[in-house]
Amino acid sequence: MKLLKSNPVLTLFNDYIVDSPAPSNISYLWNFGSLLGICFIIQIITGVFLAMHYTPNIDLAFLSIEHIMRDVNNGYIIRYMHANGAGFFFICVYIHIAKGIYYGSYRKPRVFLWTIGVIIFFLMIIIGFLGYVLPFGQMSLWGATVITNLCSAIPWIGTDLVNFIWGNYSVSNATINRFFSLHYLLPFVLAALVILHLIGLHQNGSNNPLGISSNVDKIPFHPYFSYKDYVGFFSFFLIFFYFVFFTPNLLVEPDNYIPGNPLVTPTAIVPEFYLLPFYTILRSIPNKLLGVIGMVAAILIFLILPFVDISNVRSTQFKPLFKLFFYIFVVNFLILGWIGANHAELPFTIIGQYSSIFYFSYFLFIIPLLGIIENTFSSIITKNNTPLFYFLNHKL
């Protein structure tokens, strides 16, 4: 224990993990931060081992994946851990973001923390797309072609930008080399952002379910919450390894087990399941340029949350109307994902458009309006000393 507090390197570990003061009332939803750390470590380690055997060449990329699966000792486990780990990484991120929205973790004094988190999320999406292209199956090839071709919608420079990304006039060796290099490099940029995220967290401390200051009631992270995290780790690995060993291809497109062929178009080009909601928003807007803007805006719109939420109350536990619309938003997000997995035909296109409208309306109109309503009710109740707010909160 003395070494933990005297050694300059171990002191950081001690301050951030062992003796870090945490609110005494945080729930298991706060486990997802540490679970994301576990997912990130899994992706880094398995990714390094996969890179040792992968060949970024359009003629050999698919074969090198098969070589990893068939000839490398335990290569299939490493590949399935990396592929399924990406899906679990995003699932944990979505729950982590939902927790932040529900408990108001984006509000002052944690605006910097939230901003870095959104940037991390955006970078994760880019890294995930780059990795999706590398196996160079049918879905990888056509996904790369379609998604990168969206840049052509940018006025004046669009076509030149697409050719610059491809390194040619079509997806070629130059493209897959660039994607592989960036897919290997960007996780280390992501690691730097994660460190910034932890610094921001350490500066103001964790939020808590009540959304109030917990300075008077904090306890050390270890052993009280580290053991709580161990329960989360065990549950996570139980589910994760079930997918890895028993249903490793459940979340994988079957077309990606066919070598990429630029002369044959798949019946449907869809991204990984964790990007489907944003793909739906892209597809729901008929104009190509506006669709691209809408897709990017759907990701970056989380940045405006600290500024549009004007409610005097932080936590949704005490905001019954916000709670109702939050659950509607979650269901709407799942609907967007479901629509993205279906063909662009009626009635899916109409449902996707209405869901996309609600998605943006939630951030731009509903949250500010709810803040005005809640502040008005709060001031009336405080002035008249009536139990109406208490009644509504328990009824809803």
UniProtKB/Swiss-Prot annotation:
The chain crosses the membrane at residues 32-52, 76-98, 113-133, 179-199, 225-245, 289-309, 321-341, 348-368. Binds 2 heme b groups non-covalently. Its cofactor is heme b. It holds the Pfam family Cytochrom_B_C. GO terms for cellular component: mitochondrial inner membrane; respiratory chain complex III. It is found in: Mitochondrion inner membrane. Signal peptide: none annotated. It is a multi-pass membrane protein. Heme b b562 binds at H82, H183. PANTHER family: CYTOCHROME B. Heme 1 (or BL or b562) is low-potential and absorbs at about 562 nm, and heme 2 (or BH or b566) is high-potential and absorbs at about 566 nm. This is Cytochrome b. It comes from Zancudomyces culisetae (Gut fungus). The lineage of its organism: Eukaryota, Fungi, Fungi incertae sedis, Zoopagomycota, Kickxellomycotina. The gene is cob.
